[in-house]
Amino acid sequence: MVDAVVSVCLERLVKVLVKEGNVLLGYRDQFQKVQNDLQYMRSFFKDAERLKRKNEVLKCTLADLRELVYEVEDILADCQLLSNSSGKLLHGFSPIKVPAKYQMGKRLGEINVKITSIKDNITSFLGPLSQSLHGNVQEEGPPRWSSPIYDHTQVVGLEGDTRKLKDWLSQADNSGILSIGVVGMGGLGKTTVAQTVFNEKEMELHFEKRIWVSVSQKFTEDQIMRSILRNLGDANIGDDRGDLLKRINQYLLGKRFLIVLDDVWSEDTSWWLRIYEGLPKGSGSCIIVTTRIEKVARKMGVQEARIHRPKVLGEGHSWSLFCNVAFAENHGSCTSTELECVGKEIVSKCRGLPLAIKAVGGMMLCKPPYYHVWRRIADHFREELTDVDDNSVMASLQCSYDELPSYLKSCLLSLSIYPEDCEISKDQLVRWWIGEGFVPVRNGRLATEASEDCFSGLTNRCLVEVVEWDYNGKISTCKVHDMVRDQVIQIAKDESFSGLNAAHRRHLGLTTDIKEKEIVTSKKLRALISTTKSGEVNKIASSIGNKFCDFRYLRVLDLSKSIFEVPLSTLLGKISNLKHLTCFNLSNTHPLTQVPQTLEKLHNLQILDVSYCQSLKSLPPFVMTFENLVVLDVSHCGSLEFLPEGLEKLSNLQVLLGFKPARAEGEGSRISALRSLSQLRILELQLTRADEIDDNETDALTGLIEMQILTISCFNSFESDKLISKLEKVCPPLQLHELSLKFYPGKTSPKWLNPTSLPMLRYLSICGGNLAQLDKSFWGNDETCWKIKGLKLDSLSHLSVKWEMIQRVMPSLRTVHACWSPELISFPIEGVGFRGGVWKEDRNN
């Protein structure tokens, strides 16, 4: 992690040394010395990071260095702030700048002395301690994890396990509720077995109600009952415990149901006995409990004859699972005998544990397919392993962490602040990474693209678990596997990334049960992030707002999904002191009717998110002076009528969501302002009236050659005929990769929706509206056809299209999502007129 922190700092140092030469005059030599020393030490960091787990002196030395690097970053931030705020030279004679100049020189001098001392210590320690690399490392920590989602391609060798559970489930009679236990060590596949059975089509048909409950180590009886009710579709959840259980009984009475209680730890099962007594008996209902503790299963009413204990995978299944992950790009096939030999050696170290196999397979997927590279990792892996099974798993995860690029280490550690079993928004993560500078932006790539790549890097290494996919194959939410989470939390504590030590903590998650003291005493915070679970909200007190001025170097402030006990203008009265703030998230907050004027001085903002604020009526004009904005998200703000004038000034904007152009003769930014946003990659355009587009503005999108994703939404549109006429003239950019039409008012698709006008389109989504037929241009001709891979048709009650026509014009189609569209003809998806489903191409045929 020190490597990660130093890498980010070095990158910023180089930028400042190049761009802020005048500001640094008088201190360039000192900054240059910091840079040289850090670059010298970075060559030792990889070995030092491994050695520190075995040597306390080196561990403390690296911790001291990490703190100093943070201080260097703070000085850099202050330096840039002085330059941006005044435009005057730091060596000038302004009485305001003289104290700042003196303080900066003093701080730099102190830091250089300390860094020199640390450099000497690291150099001296690495020599005598290098041989200890071959010693054993034992990392402890109880793993925890739960998720109802699974990837069937990564289920190998569990056929016998699932068959046994299905046989037991079929034996349930009307005499009571059949209880089944799945018991074993962490990472053995208990949850996967339950997931597979839970998602079987025959189970869906057999049980009228299926309920998945993730039971974490910290839970309450009320939380369990609320989770059951949410599974049953009851969103109106009250507070009375007796009423909760009564409503559960009413929902399940007379129905055959299956309840999975996943990852139960508590040996005090009295909570479950009370819930169990309130469940209706009979009807062939079943309960599956997964746990590591056999005693827990027994106390929850599972008989010995109904306890299943999964075994570790054999060599063949272990290798197959590894290949499915490590050679995913080659359809799970290893074609090199050399790699197969060393690969099987690596797999053998995992000892048949599916979690370890998948994690290591994900790591190898990202490695060059060269024997010497795999040989090196195999040798290192052996050194990390111990003879204790649980510790072997943690060693495999530690190995995956050690092999991460430095920037991905910071990204992975950001997951440490989220509660157990929390579903994490991908957008929240990647925007945080952009705001704090975790993501390296090189070779002309933009921050939004680089951050998406970082997220993909974690998923490819199986370090995060996918909860929900979008139709386009992108991940919208994820979870952290319990074992990964334990390891990440431990590392984050050691590195003061997050943890219990408020004096050094840099990152903190806002949860419903967090104490105010935890926030106000964390004065070194870089990021304060809302980490509430689905359906929960934070209550933000005014006393916390009064402490914002203490978080001098806060970069990321995420107050999403919060309720403010005082007016926001009062709560954020001192937020103008957060001069270094780069990411501010107020999405889904209540009540937010206007953006406070105190934000006006936050000119370093790169990300502003006020989405899902239904009461927000307007954005203040000063937002259009934030020239560093990369992301502006005002989507799903029902009361917001337009954006203020000046949108064209946001030349660095890469993502603009919820843009409502001003009407003719009205105030605000017109659609023509988009012409100036040359870096725009993602645009969501909301159109409701014809006068929001002039005839001379219909080509406003054409010149946006970097745009990849476009959404056009016409929800609650007026003057449909006139608006349709304007929409027909819109010219999306040729290189568009993904298009979404929402609530399109016309009965026929626009003529520009054709394979010639959009030759690069890969994903198409059409949701809602009056569409009844696709224009003849949509079907192309003998020489042109779509290159679309993913198609989504949702809530199109009038659209009549034949499946064979879709197949003909979209030969590259891989996935189709279709629902609530009853006029679709011969689609290979059951219930397309209702909830529908997903069709995926069978590549084996």
Task: Outline where the language-model segments fall.
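Leucine-rich repeat
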Residues: 9, 45, 56, 149, ...
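Surface-exposed helical/coil interface segments that assemble multiprotein signaling complexes
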Residues: 75, 80-90, 96-98, 103, ...
